[in-house]
Amino acid sequence: MDKDNQALDELPMLTGSKHANKRLFAAFMIFGLLNNVLYVIILSAALDLVSADTPKGVVALFNIFPALITKVVWPLLSNGKIRYTRRVGFCTICSWFGIITIALSSSLSPRLLGISLASLSSGMGELTFLQLTTTLPTEATSKTALGAWSSGTGFAGVAGAGIWWLLRGLGVKGGLGLSSFLPLFFPITYKYILPPFSHLEASSDSSPYQRLPMSSSLSNNNNFRPPAILISVPSSEYVPQHTPLLSSGFIDRDRDRNRDGEELTDGDKRLMGMRASRLTTQEKMKLLRPLVVRYMLPLCAVYVEEYVINSGVAPTLVFPLPTYGLWSWLFKSPRDYYPFWSLTYQTFVFLSRSSLSLGLPPIPKRLLPLPAIIQFLVLSLLFLQAKTFFFSSPAYTPPADGDGGVDRSITIVFLLICLEGLCGGSGYVNTFYHVGREGSVSENYDADGDNEMGGDRRTVNVTEMEKKAMEREFRIGAVGAADSTGILFASLISMPLEIALCRSQVDQGRTMCREL
């Protein structure tokens, strides 16, 4: 009879968990889309935001530098528990105020202030939601969330360019004013779409998990609800990551409520009070050192290379207009080349960032430098084309402009930019996938259930578990600075590189880059 009652009690949770993973995927995809779409809209609107005599690189600089500072400094300075609800609220207000400031201003200074605020929100948002993926109940749900986040950020590139293309006719005030409603979906998604983590936990009950028995001193406390610590035989798919009750996911970092909005019991609060876990500066630096070579340098290199291509080389990849075939339908003016290269790049970034969501296996950790190596080859080949017209047939090699037909180098450049997008997206999603797996609970237990310190797994060191969760949050937050660092370096390289490549083309008799 007791078993029947227990089954009836668990039925609502099992029913509620039916669509929990779908809600999780949708929530993190929306988070990724919202976090990056304003960044793309602002870059797409750069020509309209500054005067003709102001370098457009100023917009790019103010659009990336505050985000970089946030992602570099915040993980090192912040300590203790992360209050995700407050962070989401901060990102919403900061992003909305920034875009409204841009829309309602007509001079350069307040617009740059608004761009900086939007950038600050974007940096804090990426830091927050990447850290949130490490707090989910199982490795499978973390993988789902990370894949959805990556897909959303990838789609933001296509969506942002498309939104501004549709709204540009309304001008800066009208177009950006309409875009200002987008940040309001952050709290809506966080509160109403993101599922309670207990539902995600319930959806994993059919997997070979066992709840970790608590010590008698805790389990005998009538006011104490045992944390749902999940332990299983090590597997490649489902690996428990943390204690959901104590982690920053299940307890929403508010003192009196959990992620489900339920009041915490006195036992929960006492257990939270037991936590003295804080990462010292020395501990953070110890965690950071192995991340630099293993993850941050390869990711930074990928971003330097791809943004040098996008901002420094791609604007000079201009060809005589084709007179037949598909390319003649796409390119009606020399000004059509650069937007097409950008769209191609963004599309393939979206596809590669969605690889985890599409069920493709991640690349092995030892191969994480591979996207950067391939990206360097792509950069080198495109540089040669822009500098020496390496792939052009003799009829299209300057000073000749062809006598009708299609320059074969258009197709080659298109394929190389497709590869560029695949490498960039792959470097991002695979790096954060492997960073998120570091320090999981399963690494601290052997197959017999004994932990690294020789203790029985039936005795739970709550403080140590919570500290492990903080370490995972710090790792993924710290690595997040690598991409913004790469973009900043690329912007410093790209401006003089574009000028030098265009001057070289003009010297050879091809002046199209000056006529755009």
From Swiss-Prot:
Domain of life, source organism: Eukaryota
Organism: Cryptococcus neoformans var. neoformans serotype D (strain JEC21 / ATCC MYA-565)
BP terms from Gene Ontology: amino acid transport; regulation of intracellular pH
Organism ancestry: Eukaryota, Fungi, Dikarya, Basidiomycota, Agaricomycotina
GO CC terms: cell division site; cell tip; fungal-type vacuole membrane; vacuole
Function: Involved in vacuolar transport and vacuole pH homeostasis. Also required for cytokinesis.
Subcellular locations according to the entry: Vacuole membrane
Annotated membrane topology: Multi-pass membrane protein
Keyword set includes rRNA-binding: no
Membrane-spanning parts: 24-44, 57-77, 88-108, 112-132, 146-166, 169-189, 371-391, 409-429
Primary location group: membrane
Similarity-based family: Belongs to the battenin family.
UniProt keyword list: Amino-acid transport, Membrane, Transmembrane, Transmembrane helix, Transport, Vacuole
Protein name: Protein BTN1
